[in-house]
Amino acid sequence: MGMAVVVSPTQRPRPYPFKPVCSSTSKCRPAVILPGLGNNSGDYKKLEMTLNEYGVSTVVANVSRLDWFRNAAGLADPNYWRGTLRPRPVLDWYFKRIDEAIEKAKPLAPEGSLSLIGHSAGGWLARVYMEEFGFSDVSLLLTLGTPHLPPPKASPGVIDQTRGLLNYVEENCPKPVYTPQLKYVCVAGRYIQGARFFGNSYVDVDSVVPVNSDQPISEVAVMNNETNSTSVSTAFRARLVGQGYKQVCGQADVWGDGVVPEISAHLDGALNISLDGVYHSPVGSDDMLRPWYGSPAVVEKWIHHLLN
């Protein structure tokens, strides 16, 4: 059973009297950021700068948006059409980028260990990398909005978007065990609650996200204070988001970060954290109105795992 921690809604960025950093007598472990599906290295530049401010030397795996088209090679594999696709050799290009980033970060590691930060698919790709190539250099895997779990089989209307890749991860990668030698931390966002496309989709969010506060508010919560036309538009988006959630976890009316459901971003055996008001991607995010996992005020909620 994993350990779960629920953190109160993310506060708006504000000046702090001090920022926790590594002590002058010891350097932090360096961190390697692993981009999510469709993202490129540049999307994480601001996160890299934020981590550097905490004293965490950071390397971002070298990935471009065009690189992701390499995955189309999987279409030639019969396992793709059977839904039993394996990560290798289709994703070997990504594992090579992980390896190159780790080699670049090693000289920055005072004690020979480093942290992996996997965003979205980068999190489960890190798990495959650790299984295939070893993890002697890794002391922390921190995942941000990673869909760790495969969708339920034989669920009506659900198609495995990974074509079996997450089933492979579930069946072949070691179950996380949070230990002093290797820590697993899984961070999930609660940005918007999905809704079923048909049927009763009313969502009462007053008890989840306070509306009359200085906190960023999830999009479903905004329905309480908007005009009817805007509420209908927001409700329709909740249904669309819910259909996305359903393809990942088999349920539409659950909370998530707008792309990955909260329940899919947690792992048994890991330290699981949920953050209210946190959006999935750096693309389309806004540090004030739509903060993502790498926004400064959100990083503050998980940075201590890299500093310890």
Regions found by a protein language model. Give the residues of each.
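Lipid deacylating catalytic domains
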Residues: 2-308
